[in-house]
Amino acid sequence: MTGYEARLITFGTWMYFVNKEQLARAGFYAIGQEDKVQCFHCGGGLANWKPKEDPWEQHAKWYPGCKYLLEEKGHEYINNIHLTRSLEGALVQTTKKTPSLTKRINDTIFPNPMLQEAIRMGFDFKDVKKIMEERIQTSGSNYKTLEVLVADLVSAQKDTTENESNQTSLQREISPEEPLRRLQDEKLCKICMDRHIAVVFIPCGHLVTCKQCAEAVDRCPMCSAVIDFKQRVFMS
């Protein structure tokens, strides 16, 4: 499906809102299920097309890390799409940030190649943007290394999961030793139950194994998802 003509053929008697030639040029091909399409390069899927929607814009909106998209449209195009969405969202939300501060933060975030790299690794755009904004507001500068960014993203995801779990656990009594035991168990590798967890699996985001055990698996032991990338993290 790397060729335009090959993708175009898949649309056959396409009768939906969006022009099939535009879809094919944007890297998409029809998968034979209603108006569902998929990018030949990044594998990203889209459906439920609305009138006048632009395939390139939707590609950039949902899959900004796609290398085909980057080669064809460039970083500036992708950044402008997300900047426009951010500014539109700011118009309908009450916020304490001034317009000049919002622009300064966005000007710092969007050109940063680590934004695209984190998205390519499977992290959600909104999560990456949010944590970068918080970093700039607290320290005055963006992340310097991808490793620190990934570690903070994983930590934020872990905190969210723990907060949801804590709401349930507060409904039942636990012994004084239980929190300490649980904390110790959470830090142990779920395979060897001996060493501390030290690797996050991408794209599922699970942090469940030590470095040694991570090297021996191709699928996440927690959810069985295929592992595309293994990121070393350092737990405090």
Curated annotation (Swiss-Prot):
Source organism of the structure: Pan troglodytes
GO cellular component terms, semicolon-separated: cytoplasm; nucleus
Family: Belongs to the IAP family.
Entry-linked Pfam families: BIR, UBA_BIRC2-3, zf-C3HC4_3
Sequence intervals crossing the membrane: none
Domain of life where this protein originates: Eukaryota
Subunit structure: Binds to caspase-9.
Protein name (Swiss-Prot/TrEMBL): Baculoviral IAP repeat-containing protein 8
UniProt gene name: BIRC8
SMART domains: BIR, RING
Hydrolase among keywords: no
